[in-house]
Amino acid sequence: MDYKSKILSVLLNKYENSKTAHTGERSAQRPQFSFRQKHELSKAYNDEMDYTNRLEINTALKDLIRKKIIEVKWEKWEENRIAEKVYLQYDFIPQAYREAGIEPKIEKMNRILKVLEPLAVHSWEWVRQWYKEVQQSFQNNKTARINLNDVKGYELLVKALSRLEGLEDSIPKRTFSQLVFGDTKLFETTIQNRLLIIYKRYGDIEYESDKEYLESIGILENIQPVYIKGNVDIRVRGEKIALGSFPGGFGLMDETIKELEIQYVHDESIMLIENMTTYYEQIKKNNNILFIYTGGFPKKNVQQLLKKLNIYLENHPVPVYHYGDLDYGGIQIFEYIKRSFFSGLEPYMMDVATYRQFVKYGMEFGEGYEEKLLKMLENEQYSLWHELIKEMLKEKKRVEQEVIVRNVI
């Protein structure tokens, strides 16, 4: 074993995590370690079954003493034979790095920051917030959970985030990976997990699955149309199309949504539905409502349609309702849609009375879920839901749409 490098690695690690490395002001207590404490080096040094380890370590210590990089305190009466403590000499720290073949931590940090620099002006706030925290942590000599040795990995992350912010439409994961990296699996195997960790920590919306997190930034497992059913006229490339002519509704692909113009909504109201089963049951029995399936949090193509619908409603007001799960996620989805698209959005069958009627079919939740509901209860942004949240906390159950559909039919 290269004991010289091992000794210096331990000492330099202690130095890099010290106040001295951060402030430049030398502490009276130099970076050091003791062979009396339990660690890998002391285990080898004090191995009575293999005395050669001590001889090799002593040889390494004496060479480093000769080069003035370290100072050694020997056991009493055992000078040059049994070491007790090893100290790093401040004046010879640069030589210690060179001798060990180790790149200084500060240089690694600076290189990572240079790689991450484009994220300082990224259009997504959670990305900018993460970059800012990394920058501040580095200034305080903390790594902020950054792998300083994985420069390539962060280069790939920056490349992915830079391309994602410019996406107008959603894109299948493997198509995106091939387009950006020339490898259909690289995003999923190398970048996805790191991106999700950052997004979950700094994003302002808490999704229920990795799939939903990725969909919210435009990454899909597969392309999905937007399902819509109602008596609405649209125009695409100059041609008028009456969607009311399709009794089972219609699936709009991204390119169609991009080019369509909403001409007229003949229905008396609009209902956004979170769950597919509920959507299908509702379109069977209602003929004067425009239904749109959101599939949980609206994906990019759903968002594009909702934006166009919102523009139409500015001059042709029609009531808009959202029908979602009676749980933490359902509340979040409602508030997101209200905040982003329809300020007058109203909930449908998401009240205390509906909850009480179907709570016996609900799913129990644990302490972590309860804590999230309690935070909502403390936030006035969710005041519309406080009575429902109190009821959920009392019953310790959440009610999904499928339960309501199944027990009403």
From Swiss-Prot:
Under Gene Ontology molecular function, one entry of this record is: DNA binding
* Highest rank taxon of the organism: Bacteria
What GO CC annotations are associated with the protein? chromosome
Disruption-associated phenotype? When this gene is missing the Wadjet system does not confer plasmid-transformation resistance in B.subtilis.
Q: Per its UniProt record, what InterPro entries does this chain match?
A: JetD_C (IPR024534), Spo11/TopoVI_A_sf (IPR036078)
The family database entries (Pfam families) matched by this protein are listed as:
JetD_C (PF09983)
The function of this protein is: Component of antiplasmid transformation system Wadjet type I, composed of JetA, JetB, JetC and JetD. Expression of Wadjet type I in B.subtilis (strain BEST7003) reduces the transformation efficiency of plasmid pHCMC05.
State what protein this is by name: Wadjet protein JetD
